Design a protein with these regions (language model features):
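Selected transmembrane alpha-helices and immediately adjacent juxtamembrane segments
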Residues: 1-31, 118-233, 237, 306-330
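Alpha-helical transmembrane segments of polytopic integral membrane proteins
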Residues: 21-29, 34, 38-42, 69-76, ...
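Conserved phosphate-handling catalytic cores of large alpha/beta enzymes
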Residues: 71-149, 252
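Transmembrane helix-loop junctions at the membrane interface of multipass transporters and ion channels
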Residues: 98-121, 290-301, 322-330
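Juxtamembrane helix-loop transition segments at the membrane interface in multi-pass membrane proteins
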Residues: 32-51, 75-92, 139-157, 293-305
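Juxtamembrane inter-helical linkers in multi-pass membrane proteins
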Residues: 39-69, 144-168, 212-214, 256-257
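Membrane-water interface of transmembrane alpha-helices in multipass transporters/channels
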Residues: 37-42, 55-57, 84-87, 114-125, ...
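Extended, low-charge hydrophobic alpha-helical regions
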Residues: 1-8, 12, 52, 73-85, ...
């Protein structure tokens, strides 16, 4: 009973409640794809992207990255240059994917009620700016050289077909729903198990005595400079490795509340400043397991993949720490 109600329903249900927002995002991306506009945007952006060491072709994968990192990384296969392809793969995860929207929505509603839209837009801009900075660093270090000339056949403009848009939309939304009932489903069960039992596999009455608490408490000091050291918060970040949507569902399970009341529960674990630091960290830290697996497949190198994960975690920690520490001084 506890597994079904407190684990599965609380976890998967809280994630599915954000499906309308995510479907809306995918709907507009699908329209842009079907009209032939994407290719023209790539052509227009070529001159600008060359300043940071990329070609216009890199723009399309990074734009898709705002929907999901997995198809975005796979889309880099269309890039002719191996240099451009690898560089685009490294930068794409900095484009905030739709799976992070539930996290932004919950925290913005709880801590930035008057400025929800501004904070969310600010997060997206932060990701883009960080991506540009990282690109400039890579351009002058590991990826010296010039991007290949831009050559692309531009398709004719056309009115979007309802059938084509519907198929594109379903393909993208289906992936989100499948993850909710597979990756997030199993992640929720694992989190429930770790929260319910202690090291001796005895059922605990207080979740602070659970296996999950031990893991969260072990890593929580790392996040103290960022303003959040609550084991429930750090544990939710661990679950975020399985799927970013799982961060919200894990918090809902650990705080024994529903998504609707999660904002109230979060006020006891965060200040406004630490909430902003958490959002910045969540924006920038390593993408989900599916995206990491795709990076491994495209780069064909475990060492480079591990390097990408470590680099993103370090960038996220440094930026989150800067936000909290500088904010505390003001």
């Amino acid at each position: 009973h506890s597994l079904i109600i407190d684990g599965v329903f609380a976890g998967v249900g809280s994630v599915l409640s954000f499906l309308p927002i995510i479907v809306t995002l995918f709907f507009f991306l699908s329209i842009l794809e079907d009209t032939g506009y994407m290719a023209r945007v790539a052509f227009v952006m070529d001159k600008l992207l060359r300043k940071i060491g990329l070609s216009g072709r890199s723009f399309v994968p990074m734009l898709i990255g705002f929907g999901c990192s997995v198809p975005a990384i796979m889309a880099t296969r269309t890039l002719v240059s191996d240099r451009d392809r690898k560089m685009t793969i490294l930068l794409t995860p900095y484009m905030s994917c739709s799976a992070k929207i539930p996290i932004y929505a919950v925290f913005c509603a709880a801590f930035f009620k008057k400025y929800q839209a501004l904070v969310m837009i600010g997060l997206y801009i932060t990701g883009i700016v960080l991506g540009i900075i990282i690109a400039l660093i890579l351009k002058n270090t590991a990826f010296r050289g010039k991007p290949v000339p831009f050559v692309m056949e531009l398709p004719n403009y056309r009115l979007p077909s309802a059938k084509s848009v519907g198929l594109l939309l379903w393909d993208k939304a289906k992936d989100f729903i499948q993850r909710a009932f597979t990756v997030i489903f199993f992640a929720t069960i694992i989190i429930w198990f770790l929260e319910t039992f202690d090291a001796k596999l005895n059922v605990v009455k207080d979740s602070s005595d659970s296996l999950l608490a031990l893991i969260g408490q072990a890593i929580s000091p790392i996040f103290k400079p960022l303003g959040f050291a609550d084991w429930r918060v750090t544990t939710s970040l661990i679950s975020g490795f399985t799927a970013k949507e799982a961060v919200v569902s894990t918090m809902a399970v650990l705080m024994n509340t529903s998504t609707a009341n999660l904002g109230t529960a979060l006020s006891g674990a965060f200040s406004t400043l630490s909430a902003l630091s958490f959002l910045v960290f969540t924006l920038l830290y390593t993408p989900c397991v599916a995206a990491v697996a795709t990076i491994k497949r495209e780069l064909d190198s475990r060492i480079q993949t591990v390097g990408v994960v470590i680099m993103q975690c370090m960038v996220a920690w440094l930026c989150g720490c800067a936000v909290y520490q500088i904010g505390a001084l003001l």
